[in-house]
């Protein structure tokens, strides 16, 4: 297992390099001139050219790429073109609000989704199953931005129960986490149901029932452990999706996180911030997949990696 983990970690190097190259080319193909956006609409050509020189945009593309890669290897992603603050500081300041929003969304989505999936599997083809799957399909079908606007209109504007923007208290997390986690809960419910339906028909489940074990204990002890193997994969992928896919939700709720920072950076063509954020999201996905593989072996000792 240790050798497998080390090999996967070493595999990060070429993967991140390829991502770095693609991101660099992508951001430089975006329409618009960062120097003109930063200088302002009333700036003349001389001022814009001066800004370009200050930002290093007057250098050849290959020179900019070498400067970017050589500094990134040392953990230096440069300065933000807009705020002139270190990119690492900008990301660090926005990371925790996004992380806590992701964790909050993931916790309730996993609890609700797995509970709904187990109930639907145990009472298959009956009204609990139909109700759970109807709610799940609705959760998947409803766009995040539309759900967010609906929740704001009902609970903030009409009822005045919850705040709309900010991240200062636990109340601020309720609406964004519900919006962000709705689709994940729906996916978890459907995936858990499918996995549990397969497990409930296995021989060891019938054997446990024949021995007089209560149905609740059969489901929780024998069914849950074996059904969790494919579900853990989905949990890992969904957690990565939440970390990198909170852009729309953060924009709707004006959340001070990485998603909104990325949107603002794209609008202003802030190349260093865009490159650093996408690299960070890529690293998160790779590490989450590695953790999922390790959890595989922890849940099912029969699984071994070489």
Curated annotation (Swiss-Prot):
Q: What is the role of this chain?
A: Part of the ABC transporter complex GsiABCD involved in glutathione import. Probably responsible for the translocation of the substrate across the membrane.
Query: Which stretches are Periplasmic in the membrane topology?
Result: 30-102, 156-168, 250-277
Gene this protein is translated from:
gsiC
Q: Which family does it belong to?
A: Belongs to the binding-protein-dependent transport system permease family.
Task: Give the record's subunit note.
Answer: The complex is composed of two ATP-binding proteins (GsiA), two transmembrane proteins (GsiC and GsiD) and a solute-binding protein (GsiB).
Q: Which residues lie on this side of the membrane: Cytoplasmic?
A: 1-8, 124-134, 190-228, 299-306
Its recorded name reads: Glutathione transport system permease protein GsiC
Q: Does the keyword Lipid metabolism apply?
A: no
Q: Which UniProt keywords apply?
A: Cell inner membrane, Cell membrane, Membrane, Transmembrane, Transmembrane helix, Transport
Query: What organism does the UniProt record list as the source?
Result: Escherichia coli O157:H7
ABC transmembrane type-1 domain spans which residues? 95-292
């Amino acid at each position: 297992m240790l050798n497998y983990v080390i090999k996967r970690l070493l595999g990060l190097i070429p993967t991140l390099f390829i991502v770095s190259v693609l991101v660099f080319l992508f951001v430089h193909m975006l329409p618009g001139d960062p120097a003109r956006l930063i200088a302002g609409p009333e700036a003349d050509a001389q001022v814009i050219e001066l800004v370009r020189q200050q930002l290093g945009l007057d250098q050849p593309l290959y020179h900019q790429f070498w400067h970017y890669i050589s500094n990134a290897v040392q953990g230096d992603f440069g300065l933000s073109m807009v705020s002139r603050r270190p990119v690492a500081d900008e990301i660090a300041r926005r990371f925790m609000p996004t992380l806590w929003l992701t964790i909050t969304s993931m916790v309730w989505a996993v609890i609700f989704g797995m509970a709904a999936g187990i109930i639907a599997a145990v009472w298959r083809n009956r009204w609990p199953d139909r109700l759970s799957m109807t709610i799940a399909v609705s959760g998947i079908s409803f766009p995040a931005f539309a759900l967010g606007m609906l929740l704001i209109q009902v609970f903030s504007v009409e009822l005045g129960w919850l705040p709309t923007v900010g991240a200062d208290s636990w109340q601020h997390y309720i609406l964004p986490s519900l919006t962000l986690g709705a689709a994940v809960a729906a996916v978890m419910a459907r995936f858990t149901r499918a996995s549990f339906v397969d497990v409930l028909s296995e021989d060891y489940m019938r054997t446990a029932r024949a021995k007089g074990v209560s149905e609740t204990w059969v489901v929780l002890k024998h069914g849950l452990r074996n059904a969790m193997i494919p579900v853990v994969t989905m949990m890992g992928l969904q957690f990565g999706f939440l970390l990198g896919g909170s852009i729309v939700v953060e924009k709707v709720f004006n959340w001070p996180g990485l998603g909104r920072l990325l949107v603002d950076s794209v609008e202003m063509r802030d190349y260093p911030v865009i490159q650093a954020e996408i690299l960070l999201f890529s690293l998160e996905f790779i590490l989450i997949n590695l953790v999922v593989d390790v959890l595989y072996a922890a849940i099912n000792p029969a699984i071994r990696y070489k």
